[in-house]
Design a protein with these regions (language model features):
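Glycine-rich phosphate-binding active-site loops on the catalytic face of alpha/beta enzymes
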Residues: 57-62, 80-95, 142-159, 178-218, ...
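Histidine-centered metal-binding segments
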Residues: 211-241
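Structural motif
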Residues: 29, 81, 113-114, 139, ...
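Glycine-rich, proline-tolerant flexible connector loops at the mouths of alpha/beta enzymes
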Residues: 23, 27-43, 61-66, 86-104, ...
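Catalytic cores of alpha/beta
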Residues: 45, 66-77, 128-139, 161-172, ...
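Alpha-helix-loop-beta-strand connector modules within alpha/beta enzyme cores
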Residues: 38, 42-63, 98-125, 142-143, ...
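Generic N-terminal amphipathic, Lys/Arg-enriched alpha-helix
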Residues: 1-14, 20-27
Length: 241
C-alpha cells in the first residue's frame, strides 16, 4: 500500500522539525511522495535526495480562488524549487458559474509550465453537485492532466459515492487520487479497491502500522503489541518473535 500514498503535511503551523519527521518517515516506509506547502519544497528535496520519494506541492491551495496568473507563477516557482508533482485547486466558483473555458484554460496554462511533471487537479467534490463533479471530470479528461483529486482536506473529504461517479466519467488514462478523512488502513483499502491509484493522507504512518488483530476477541483493529479497547491484547506478530 505504501507506494500509493502521498504523505501530506499542509498545516499552516508546520515547522522544519515537522517536515523533517515527515520526510524521514517517507524514506522509511517508501511512500510515493510527501506533499508539502511551497515554502518547504527545497527542504523536502534536500532531505529526500537519496531516496525514491518524490516531492509534491500545492497550487492555488486551498481555495482555488487565486487568479490564473498567480497559479502559473506558483507553478513556475515550485518547478524551479525542485517539486516533482503538483496538486492544483481549480477555481471552484468559476466551475459552479459555468465558466468552463476559464477553468480549462487555467489548468492548461499551469500544465504548460510544468515540464511534463505530474499534475493532479483538485475538484473539491464536497462543494459540488453531481452534475458539477461530472463536468469537472470531463474537464480533466480534456486537459490531459494526470490525476483528478477529490479534496483539499479543508472541507469534507473523499466518499465512496464520489469515487464511483468519477470512475464512471473519467477517461482510461486519467488516474484518481482520494484525499480527506482517510485515517485508517480500512479507509484506504476501500478506495484502492475502487481503482484509486493515489491516497492523500496526513495519517500515512498510522495507516501502514494498522494491523488486523486476529487473536482479539472483539475482532477489531489495534496497533501491534498494544492492548485493544476490549481488554485483550494483539498477538499478530508473536509468531515472528
Amino acid at each position: 500500500m505504501n507506494e500509493y500514498i502521498d504523505s501530506t503535511l499542509l498545516k499552516a503551523d508546520a515547522t522544519i522539525e515537522d517536515i523533517t519527521k515527515l520526510c524521514e518517515d517517507a524514506k522509511k516506509y517508501h511512500f510515493a511522495t510527501v506533499c508539502v506547502n511551497p515554502y518547504y519544497v527545497p527542504l523536502a528535496k534536500e532531505l529526500l535526495e537519496d531516496s525514491t520519494v518524490e516531492v509534491a506541492t500545492v497550487i492555488g491551495f486551498p481555495l482555488g480562488a487565486a487568479t490564473t496568473n498567480v497559479k502559473v507563477y506558483e507553478a513556475v516557482d515550485a518547478v524551479e524549487a525542485g517539486a516533482d508533482e503538483f496538486d492544483m485547486v481549480i477555481n471552484i466558483g468559476a466551475l459552479k458559474d459555468g465558466e468552463i473555458e476559464y477553468v480549462k484554460n487555467e489548468i492548461e496554462q499551469v500544465r504548460n509550465v510544468l515540464d511534463g511533471k505530474v499534475l493532479k487537479v483538485i475538484i473539491e467534490t464536497s462543494l459540488l453537485t453531481k452534475e458539477e463533479i461530472i463536468k469537472a471530470v470531463e474537464i480533466c479528461n480534456e486537459t490531459f492532466v494526470n490525476f483528478v483529486k477529490t479534496s483539499t482536506g479543508f472541507n469534507k473529504g473523499a466518499s465512496i459515492e464520489d469515487i464511483k461517479l468519477i470512475n464512471e466519467y473519467k477517461s482510461d488514462v486519467l488516474e484518481v487520487k482520494a484525499s480527506g478523512g482517510i485515517k485508517t488502513k480500512k479507509d484506504a483499502e476501500k478506495f484502492l479497491k475502487l481503482g484509486v491509484t493515489r491516497i492523500g493522507t496526513s495519517n500515512a504512518v498510522k495507516i501502514l502500522d494498522d494491523c488486523d488483530c486476529e487473536d482479539c476477541n472483539c475482532g477489531d483493529e489495534c496497533n501491534c503489541g498494544e492492548e485493544c479497547h476490549c481488554g485483550d491484547k494483539c498477538h499478530c506478530h508473536d509468531k515472528e518473535d
